[in-house]
Amino acid sequence: MQFLKHIIFFSIFFIGFRAQSQVTVHPMVFAGYEYQNSNFGEVGARFIFLKNDNVLYRVSGSALMGKVNGEFAVLPKFQGDILLNFEKNVDIQHSYYFLAGTEITPQFVAPKAGISLFGIIDFTSGYAFQLGNNQLNDRAMEGLNLNFTVNIPLVVFSKSKKNK
C-alpha cells in the first residue's frame, strides 16, 4: 500500500510538471544491470521531461529480473531522476550530466547519484533501505546499490518525414 502511495505522489508531481508550458517529453526504452544484494538484469521504459538541456527530469518503470537465493525473481521498480549540466553555449560540454535520483520497489527505496554520458549511458550508485520486513526469496534487499543502464531514445525508430 505504501508503494502505491509513492507511485501516486510521483505521478501527480510529474503531471504537474508536464502542465507547465513548453516542456518537451521524450520516450525511451532501456536495459541494464543492477546489483542489489544479488545480480539483476533490468528492462523498462522511461520518459524525459525538459525545457532546455541544462536540467532534465526522468521518470521510469522497469522490471528487475534475476536469481535470488537460487530462485528466479521479478521485482517491479519505479524511478525518478534529475540530470544536471549548467555549461552554457558549449555543445561538447553537454556530453555528460550529473544524475541524482531515487528508485523504489516493494522491498526497498534507494537514493542514488551518478553520471550520464550523452543521456544514453548511466552509471549510478547508492544505498538501499529495506521497506519494513519485506524480503525477496528470504533475502534482505538493503545495502550497496550499483547500476549500469543503456537508454535507447524511441525517436531513433521514428520515420523521418521529408517535404516533397
Language-model regions, residue ranges each:
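Outer-membrane beta-barrel "beta-signal"
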Residues: 80, 141-164
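Short glycine/proline- and aromatic-enriched beta-strand/turn motifs that initiate or cap beta-hairpins
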Residues: 19-52
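Residues on the lipid-exposed face of transmembrane beta-strands in outer-membrane beta-barrel proteins
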Residues: 31-33, 43-47, 78-84, 102, ...
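Bacterial Sec-dependent N-terminal signal peptides
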Residues: 1-27
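Repeated loop/turn-to-beta-strand initiation elements of outer-membrane beta-barrel proteins
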Residues: 52-57, 86-90, 119-125, 154-158
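Transmembrane beta-strand segments that form the barrel wall of outer-membrane beta-barrel proteins
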Residues: 25-35, 55-67, 92-107, 123-131
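Gram-negative outer-membrane beta-barrel proteins
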Residues: 37-39, 67-71, 86-88, 108-110, ...
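Detector for outer-membrane/organellar transmembrane beta-barrel domains
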Residues: 38, 48-89
